[in-house]
Amino acid sequence: MAENQYYGTGRRKSSSARVFVKAGSGNIVINQRSLDQYFGRETARMVVRQPLELVDMVGKLDLYITVKGGGISGQAGAIRHGITRALMEYDETLRADLRKAGFVTRDARQVERKKVGLRKARRRPQFSKR
């Protein structure tokens, strides 16, 4: 008998995450590794857990996640967005709380492109008066 499984896609910067949620004991598997193995930084782990802590589902759901692209921060943000969407599919009544916390909205900020004549996106070459 197939268990009910809920899905959410999350994106942030150049990262995209696919999140599968089902009832369980609180296991979080990211790219075949545990949360602690995958993210060395405590802040990244905290970002991933935020939506679950908000709706008190920390030990009640198992998460299977595949994430690709970007760096640590972008991947953590993409996973958070994906978990939020999967939780909304799991229980629509959670949407209001997740929206209030700002997890439903996709963070649209992207890296600004480098411009010709500048060193970076906005950093100008040093100006010399004489």
Swiss-Prot record:
InterPro entries, sorted: Ribosomal_Su5_D2-typ_SF, Ribosomal_uS9, Ribosomal_uS9_bac/plastid, Ribosomal_uS9_CS, Ribsml_uS5_D2-typ_fold_subgr
UniProt-listed Pfam families: Ribosomal_S9 (PF00380)
A GO cellular component entry from the record: cytosolic small ribosomal subunit
SUPFAM superfamilies found in the cross-reference section: Ribosomal protein S5 domain 2-like
Keywords recorded for this protein, A-Z: Ribonucleoprotein, Ribosomal protein
Record bears the keyword Membrane: no
A Gene Ontology molecular function term of the record: structural constituent of ribosome
GO BP annotations listed: translation
Family that this chain belongs to: Belongs to the universal ribosomal protein uS9 family.
HAMAP family with a match to the protein in the record: Ribosomal_uS9_B
Protein name stated in the entry: Small ribosomal subunit protein uS9
Source organism of the structure: Sodalis glossinidius (strain morsitans)
Highest classification ranks of the organism: Bacteria, Pseudomonadati, Pseudomonadota, Gammaproteobacteria, Enterobacterales
